[in-house]
Amino acid sequence: MKILVGFTTTPEGQAALRHAVAEAKQHAAGLVIAHYEQVTPPVGDVPERYRGAEQRLDALRDELDAEGIDVTTRSEIGVATVSSKLLQVAEDEAVDLIVIGLRRRTPVGKLVLGSTAQEVLLGAGCPVLAVKRDQTA
């Protein structure tokens, strides 16, 4: 079994990561941690938050390797949407489960802005576990 989690440093992203790690431990599954930074053209300097996320991914991979979890990290920057990149990684890695974090939004916010989570839920070819930020693994 292989599990994919979208990595962000937000409370929602951290909740998703906790759940993905718990699922990986429970099922002796491989874990793919993907981080994608969407930028608008022209793409100049790599945003500082992207470099910070890459450093955190490296530390996370080492930490989880030490716990006996088979971890792969994927990090990229580009103009595609986060949801499309997450779905592409899911397909490339042939994952069995995607874990994503959810944030609370107003009904109007959901209609006007769209939703990365909704796009992943509807576009995934495997089950998706959606985690709220206040849930613990």
Located regions from the model:
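Structural beta-alpha unit
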Residues: A66-I98, T136-A137
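Short, surface-exposed alpha-helical segments at coil->helix boundaries
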Residues: P47-D58
